[in-house]
Amino acid sequence: MSSSKSHSRRPWWSTLGIYVGLSLAAFIMVIPLLFSFVMAFKSPQDFASHSPFALPSPPSLASFQAILTGRVNFGDAIITTLLVVVVMVVGQLVSSVLAAYAFARIEFPGREVIFWLFLGTMMIPASVLVIPLYLMMAKMGLNNTFWGIVLPFVFASPYAVFLLRQSFRQIPQEIIDAATMDGAGQMRILFSIVVPVSKPIISTLVLITVVSQWNSFMWPRIIAATRPRVLTVATAALQSQYNANWTYVMAATTIALVPLIALFIVFQRHIVESIALTGIK
């Protein structure tokens, strides 16, 4: 028995190699973030007269002040992005939960066919839909408007529906039957039993949706190139307005990164739980 344990034990040099490899990968990923953060606190004069890798001396908020009060109007871009994210998260989450519950727990003709057809839309590249969606929004007079940005993508996501359906199907049928016998309707079962049990996967989907919409560039750039701008489009506009003044661009990048890092820290436990549950199931 002891010999089998010793054979199954990983050699120390193998464990050391794994940790060294992971540390190196983490270092490579963190370096660009640190570089961006350091440059954001340099004044344009400091950046021009010193190495890009030198620490700011002294740290300056000039770049932040410039982008928040300049012609790009970065403050409005922050507000617009927050509104887009909130509307997208609420719209996608509510519609995805309802659709997933219907596909998982409600019997109706053609349920499996409709589900797989809906899931098949994941295979369609987003770039293929850009021109049809733009023409539809333009016909409705929604180009260069807030609703033009959110309307095409505010409803159920196939990816979210698939994950939620798999999670909902893991709930024992006996619990659903007991709630039905007690007089609970479908909506009460959904929001009193199914949703609370599925909190880890829902939290993960919220984080994925927030990150996806916060970083969205192609569609907002096409449908609302001038106004209203989101953070990514406003950051790109900084390069042309200020002749690629990199301290301004890095200040904008820092503003965009901080909320995502904070969100990850808050939702980290739920993400780990979701991954663990997915692995068990």
Q: What annotation goes with each model-predicted range?
A:
Residues M1-K5:
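ABC-family P-loop ATPase nucleotide-binding domain
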Residues S6-R10, T15-K281:
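A structural signal for multi-pass alpha-helical bundles of membrane permease subunits
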